[in-house]
Structure formats: C-alpha cells, structure tokens
Amino acid sequence: MPQLNPNPWFYIMLMSWLTFSLIIQPKLLSFTSANPPSNKTSTTTRTLPWTWPWT
C-alpha cells in the first residue's frame, strides 16, 4: 500500500508546516487588530421583562 509509505507524505507535511510557521504566521501576526482589547470592566445592563399585551 503506497499511502502507508511515510517518505513523501512526511516531507510534504513538514514543508507545509515550516512554510506556515516561518512565513505565513509572522505576516498574519503583524496585522493590528480592529478591536484591540481594553482594560475596562464590562458593565451588565439590567433588562426588565416586557409584559406581552395578549397574555
């Protein structure tokens, strides 16, 4: 069964992960986020239940 021979598949997997790790990932991490995280604490709004007119 040729698909169990790890010789070409391991090389392909290794090259694709190296390409991702060394080339693509630093380019993606250099972008600035559109919504940077803030230090503000989130406030919860109190919502009151609305009475339905037909009940």
UniProtKB/Swiss-Prot annotation:
It is a single-pass membrane protein. One of its GO terms (biological process) is proton motive force-driven ATP synthesis. It is found in: Mitochondrion membrane. Component of the ATP synthase complex composed at least of ATP5F1A/subunit alpha, ATP5F1B/subunit beta, ATP5MC1/subunit c (homooctomer), MT-ATP6/subunit a, MT-ATP8/subunit 8, ATP5ME/subunit e, ATP5MF/subunit f, ATP5MG/subunit g, ATP5MK/subunit k, ATP5MJ/subunit j, ATP5F1C/subunit gamma, ATP5F1D/subunit delta, ATP5F1E/subunit epsilon, ATP5PF/subunit F6, ATP5PB/subunit b, ATP5PD/subunit d, ATP5PO/subunit OSCP. Belongs to the ATPase protein 8 family. InterPro entries: ATP8_metazoa (IPR001421), ATPase_protein_8 (IPR050635). Residues 35-55 are annotated as: Disordered. This is ATP synthase F(0) complex subunit 8. The keyword Transmembrane helix applies. Subunit 8, of the mitochondrial membrane ATP synthase complex (F(1)F(0) ATP synthase or Complex V) that produces ATP from ADP in the presence of a proton gradient across the membrane which is generated by electron transport complexes of the respiratory chain. ATP synthase complex consist of a soluble F(1) head domain - the catalytic core - and a membrane F(1) domain - the membrane proton channel. These two domains are linked by a central stalk rotating inside the F(1) region and a stationary peripheral stalk. Pfam families: ATP-synt_8. GO terms for molecular function: proton transmembrane transporter activity. GO terms for cellular component: mitochondrial membrane; proton-transporting ATP synthase complex. Keywords: ATP synthesis, CF(0), Hydrogen ion transport, Ion transport, Membrane, Mitochondrion, Transmembrane, Transmembrane helix, Transport. PANTHER family: ATP SYNTHASE PROTEIN 8. The chain crosses the membrane at residues 7-24. Residues 41-55 have a biased composition (Low complexity). The gene is MT-ATP8.
